[in-house]
C-alpha cells in the first residue's frame, strides 16, 4: 500500500523505481499531515532514494514483517483505511534521516551509511527511536530514571503526571519510591498518618495502563524500594495475582535494592530493622560503608 505497486502488473524489476517514487511522495505526505518533520524535505531525496535496496526486505521473516507493519510504520490516519506511508526500506531510511537532522556536513552520506547497517540487521536502534525519529515528536530515549520525594506534590507531579507524558512517547520508566514515608508515618500538616506507598504505586500502575506508548504498546515502568523501608512486605506482594486488587500492580514491575549489610546480617542470622523513611532522612542517599554506619546509628 505504501508503494502503490502490483507484482503482476508492474514486475519485480520495477520495484526499486517504485521505492524511489514512493519515498519522495510519502515523505511529502507525512509532512503534509503533520506526522513527519518538515526538515526531512531539506535532504537530497533523489540521492537517498537511489540508495534504497528492496532486496533487503528478504532479511525479515513473516513475524518480523507483521510486527513492523502493526507497530512501527508511519500511518496516514486521515484516510479511511489508515494507509501505511512506509514499507521496510522506507522505514529504515526515515529513521536514519531523523537521526541526522542536526548534522551540517555530508548528511546524506552518513544517512546512507546508517541505513546500510539497519537494512542488513547489523545494528538496530531502540523502539522509541524507531517510533519517533523524523517525526514531530522526536523523543528517542528508551528509559527515564526519576526519584519521588516525600511530599504530595512530588508524588502526584513527578511520580504520576510527568511520567504520563514520558510514557506517551514510548519512554520506559524506572523510579525510586523509598523517600515516600511508609505506613503509619506522621503527617504534620493534617495531624494524620500516612497510608504508605502502596496506594500511590497503584495510581502509577493505572497511569501506565491508561497512557500507553503512542497507542503501539503498553506503558512500561518499574518502582524501586530499599530493603529497610517499612512497607517492604506489602511492596513484595504487589505483583501477586491474588489478594486485594487495590493493592496490586499488574502493569508495573517492582525491584528491591538490597545493600551488602542485609546480606551480612542474613548470613550471620542477625536481626534486620525497618524504618519509616521520614524518620531516617539521610539513609536513602547513602551507600557502602557510610550507609552501614548510619543504619547502625539509627538502630540505636
Model-derived regions, located:
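Extended catalytic cores of very large enzyme megasubunits
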Residues: 1-300
Amino acid at each position: 500500500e505504501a508503494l502503490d505497486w502490483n507484482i503482476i502488473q508492474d514486475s519485480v524489476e520495477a520495484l526499486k523505481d517504485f521505492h524511489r517514487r514512493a519515498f519522495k511522495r510519502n515523505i511529502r505526505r507525512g509532512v503534509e499531515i503533520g506526522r513527519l518533520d518538515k526538515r526531512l524535505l531539506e535532504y537530497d531525496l533523489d540521492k537517498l532514494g537511489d540508495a534504497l535496496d528492496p532486496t533487503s526486505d528478504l532479511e525479515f521473516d513473516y513475524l518480523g514483517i507483521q510486527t513492523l507493519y502493526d507497530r512501527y510504520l508511519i500511518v496516514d490516519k486521515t484516510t479511511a483505511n489508515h494507509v501505511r506511508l512506509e514499507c521496510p526500506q522506507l522505514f529504515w531510511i526515515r529513521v536514519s534521516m531523523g537521526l541526522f537532522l542536526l548534522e551540517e556536513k555530508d548528511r546524506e552520506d552518513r544517512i546512507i551509511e546508517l541505513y546500510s547497517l539497519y537494512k542488513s540487521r547489523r545494528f538496530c536502534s531502540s523502539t522509541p527511536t524507531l517510533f519517533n525519529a523524523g517525526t514531530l515528536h522526536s523523543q528517542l530515549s528508551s528509559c527515564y530514571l526519576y526519584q519521588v520525594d516525600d511530599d504530595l506534590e512530588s508524588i502526584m507531579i513527578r511520580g504520576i503526571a510527568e511520567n504520563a507524558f514520558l510514557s506517551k512517547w514510548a519512554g520506559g520508566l524506572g523510579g525510586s519510591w523509598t523517600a515516600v514515608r511508609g505506613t503509619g508515618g506522621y503527617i504534620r500538616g493534617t495531624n494524620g498518618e500516612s497510608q504508605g506507598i502502596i496506594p500511590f504505586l497503584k495510581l502509577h500502575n493505572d497511569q501506565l495502563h491508561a497512557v500507553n506508548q503512542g497507542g503501539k504498546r503498553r506503558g512500561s515502568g518499574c518502582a524501586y524500594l530499599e530493603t529497610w523501608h517499612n512497607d517492604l512486605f506489602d511492596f513484595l506482594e504487589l505483583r501477586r495475582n491474588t489478594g486485594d486488587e487495590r493493592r496490586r500492580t499488574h502493569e508495573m514491575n517492582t525491584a528491591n535494592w538490597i545493600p551488602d549489610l542485609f546480606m551480612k546480617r542474613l548470613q550471620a542470622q542477625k536481626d534486620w530493622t525497618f524504618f519509616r523513611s521520614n524518620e531516617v532522612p539521610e539513609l536513602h542517599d547513602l551507600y557502602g560503608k557510610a550507609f552501614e554506619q548510619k543504619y547502625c546509628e539509627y538502630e540505636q
